[in-house]
A protein has these predicted regions:
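Cysteine-nucleophile amide-bond enzymes
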Residues: 193, 197-199
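A generic "functional-site adjacency" signal
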Residues: 39, 105, 177-178
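N-terminal capping segments
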Residues: 1-62
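Aromatic- and glycine-rich peptidoglycan recognition patches
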Residues: 4-19, 27-29, 110-191
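...with weaker cross-activation on analogous glycine-rich loops/strands in unrelated enzymes
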Residues: 61-140
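Acidic side chains
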Residues: 40-43, 95, 189
Length: 199
């Protein structure tokens, strides 16, 4: 069960200094920063902006929707350490992604890329690419106001990227490489060679 965070709270630096730390925090907490509508998608990135003394704006005066973080307030939200970037192919793990209005979410959506864009996951149903994303209130079949989870989202409504330049964008973790030159491997190779055993 996720621990609920309500209001503007200051986190420990080790909860948001890297994407992996932020991800660990997010997956164990529900965030309702503004006290409106419980855990909205906007609340999670807004809490991150707050840690840097910034406000993630939807529109001047507030009370907007997620896609307005890009369409109306892109430049207001791209304050250091955040920069705005265009283009799906530029998505890196840890980037904050903004999506436009769709039949699934008329308010748009805002979340974090949990993998780099690779162009490998084609969704034939929606004729678009998919990407694993970390966010709140997302995914089919969930109840509204769900705390953070990771789901594959289609990128058809993608608008843009806010990148935290304080995070070193480490590549998406992949499987470990097997090293074949451990002493026991070398010994086994030598033993096979002496016995004329071929593998």
């Amino acid at each position: 069960m996720a621990q609920q965070v309500i209001g503007r709270v200051i986190l420990s630096l080790n909860q948001y200094d890297t994407y992996d730390h932020w991800r660990n925090f997010a997956l164990t907490h529900g965030v309702d920063l503004d006290g409106w509508y419980q855990n909205q998608c906007w609340d999670l990135p807004a809490l991150l902006w707050y840690q840097y003394g910034l406000s993630l704006q939807t529109k001047p005066g507030g009370d907007g929707v997620a896609y307005q973080c890009w369409t109306i307030s892109r430049y207001a939200n791209a304050q250091p350490p955040f920069i705005s970037i265009d283009g799906v192919s530029n998505i890196k793990r840890g980037d904050c992604l903004v999506f436009g209005s769709s039949s699934i979410a008329g308010t748009g959506h805002i979340c974090f890329a949990d993998t780099d864009y690779s162009g490998r996951y084609w969704d034939a149903t929606y004729n678009c690419w998919r990407l694993n994303c970390l966010g709140q209130n997302q995914g089919q079949g969930i109840s509204w106001y769900t705390p953070s989870n990771i789901v594959g989202l289609n990128l058809s409504g993608f608008l843009g990227i806010f990148r935290n330049t304080n995070w070193q964008n480490a590549p998406t973790p992949s499987g470990t490489t097997i090293k074949t030159k451990y002493p026991w491997v070398l010994y086994a190779d030598r033993l096979r060679k002496n016995r004329n055993i071929m593998i």
